[in-house]
Amino acid sequence: MRNYDLSPLLRQWIGFDKLASSMGGQEPQGFPPYNIEKSDDNHYRISLALAGFKQSELDIEVEGPRLTVRGKPTPSEKQVEYLHQGLVCKEFALTFTLAEHLQVSEAQFENGLLHIDLVRQVPEALQPQRIAIGTTPGLEAK
């Protein structure tokens, strides 16, 4: 019997909490490092660590359910010989699959962190509705 670890795939899906939380596993390795935060059932935040990037070198695109973040640093004119290179500033593209009705509300870039805020906006017609339970006086008397 084979066991497949699907957690690296599920971590790219925002808003599918029950599915993602039911599958534990190791954190995916990759660039850039990021966090996915949930503040309540309708608000999420993706934070990417992008030290060395400028705001003009970043691009955020939403196409259908896919949120793609791209970064392309401008090449340095100065040639540098590194004795140790621990900071990475390379081209990347990172794609997240968003759950239904989840939309990007805003994005901010400050102190080397790109924050993308997401909000779930379910149409009122699709939201659960509470039905009041009443009594019928005529039926109780019989």
Curated annotation (Swiss-Prot):
Gene3D superfamilies: 2.60.40.790. It comes from the Bacteria. Keywords: Chaperone, Cytoplasm, Stress response. One of its GO terms (cellular component) is cytoplasm. It is found in: Cytoplasm. Residues 25-136 form the sHSP domain. InterPro entries: A-crystallin/Hsp20_dom (IPR002068), ACD_IbpA/B (IPR037913), HSP20-like_chaperone (IPR008978), HSP20_IbpB (IPR022848). GO terms for biological process: protein stabilization. NCBIfam families: PRK11597.1. Homodimer. Forms homomultimers of about 100-150 subunits at optimal growth temperatures. Conformation changes to oligomers at high temperatures or high ionic concentrations. The decrease in size of the multimers is accompanied by an increase in chaperone activity. Belongs to the small heat shock protein (HSP20) family. This is Small heat shock protein IbpB.
